[in-house]
Amino acid sequence: MLSVPASSRIDFAGSPRPTVGVEWEFALVDAHTRDLSNEAATVIAEIGETPHVHKELLRNTVEVVTGICENTGEAMADLHDTLKVVRRIVRDRGMELFCAGTHPFANWSTQQLTDAPRYAELIKRTQWWGRQMLIWGVHVHVGISSAHKVMPIISSLLNQYPHLLALSASSPYWDGSDTGYASNRAMMFQQLPTAGLPFQFQSWPEFERFVHDQKKTGIIDHMNEIRWDIRPSPHLGTVEIRVFDGVSNIAELGSLVALTHCLVVDLDRRLDAGEQLPVMPPWHVQENKWRAARYGLDAEIILDADSNERLVTEDLDDLLTRLQPVARSLDCADELAGVAEIYRHGASYQRQRRVAEEHDGDLLAVVDALVAELEL
C-alpha cells in the first residue's frame, strides 16, 4: 500500500473511556395538516445558541444532540431535557415533532434548503438525488481509545448491520405510496456519492490513504463529506454508527443505543484480548443491508463467510444473551433487554402499516401515531 504524505496523516483524538453520544434528527410537522413545516430556522433562533440543537440540510429538520455521556441512561436523560424545551417552542408555533426514516406523504420538491455553503455545494454536485434526501436518522458515537482499533471494529460491526437496520426500520412510505420496503431511507441515502457501506479496511493507514485519494481527486474537500453508514470521527475519537432510520420514541431509542454501545465495546474488548475480529465478504454485507431494508424483521440474513443463514430475530435472541455481561458493565442491561420488545411487538415500519390498515390507508393517521409516540 502506498504511504501518504505527512500532511495527509489523520490524528485520531482517542477516548480514554467508551463514552457514548447520540444525534437524533426530527422533522417539524404542521399540527393540523401533518405535512412538513419549513420553520426550523425560526425554532432554532428562538432556542438560542446551544450545542444541543443543530440545523440540517432541509429547513424542516432540527437535530437534537447529547453531550459526552457515560452510558445510555445518561444519554437518554440528556435528550429528554433538550427535547422538552424544543417541543414547547415547536408546539407554541403550531407544529409537532415527528421522527421516522421518511414522512409518509410529504413531497420532496416543496422542501426548502438550509442556507449554508456546504449544503449548497452538496446540492450543486448531487442535483436531483441530493434534493431527494427527505430522510431522517439517528447517529450513535462510541468512544475508541486508539486509531489502530477503529477500522477492524467498523469492518466487524458490519456483521450486525442488518440487525440494527431491521430493528430501527421506519420508512415504508414515500410520497404517499407504500414502497414495499421496511427502510426506504437506507436505499435513498446510499445514492449520494461517498454514502453507503464503508470499505472494509483493516488498518488506519488504509483509511488515511483513502481520504488522501478522495481529496486529491476532488471527490471531497472535508472528511465529514465521507457519509458512510459507519464511519470514524477522528476529531471526537469515536466510531459513528449511522445505520438507523429515525426513531419515534425515547424508550426504543434507548434500547438501540444500548445495543450499539454494547456491540462496539464488545469488539473493542475482544481486540484487547488478542482476538482477530470476524468479518464477512463485502458481497454478503451488501446483500444483508438490502435484505434488512426490504424485509425488516422478516429478513433471513447471512451470518458469516461460510454463507450460513438465519432469521434476524432468531439471531438477535442469541446476540442479546451474549451481550448481557457487557451491558451490565456499561450499566445498560435494562435498556438492552428492551431490544426484544421491539421485535416482539413490532418495529416502527410494522406499526405504521398497521395504523394505515386500520384507517383505510389514511396516512394522516400514521403521522398522528408517530407524533403521539414521542412521550416526554
Curated annotation (Swiss-Prot):
One of its GO terms (biological process) is modified amino acid biosynthetic process. Its EC number is 6.3.2.2. The keyword Nucleotide-binding applies. Keywords: ATP-binding, Ligase, Nucleotide-binding. Pfam families: GCS2. The keyword Magnesium does not apply. One of its GO terms (molecular function) is glutamate-cysteine ligase activity. It is an enzyme of class 6 (ligase). It catalyses: L-cysteine + L-glutamate + ATP = gamma-L-glutamyl-L-cysteine + ADP + phosphate + H(+). ATP-dependent carboxylate-amine ligase which exhibits weak glutamate--cysteine ligase activity. Belongs to the glutamate--cysteine ligase type 2 family. YbdK subfamily. PANTHER family: GLUTAMATE--CYSTEINE LIGASE 2-RELATED (PTHR36510:SF1). NCBIfam families: gshA_cyan_rel, PRK13517.1-2, PRK13517.1-3, PRK13517.1-4. This is Putative glutamate--cysteine ligase 2-1. It comes from Mycobacterium sp. (strain KMS).
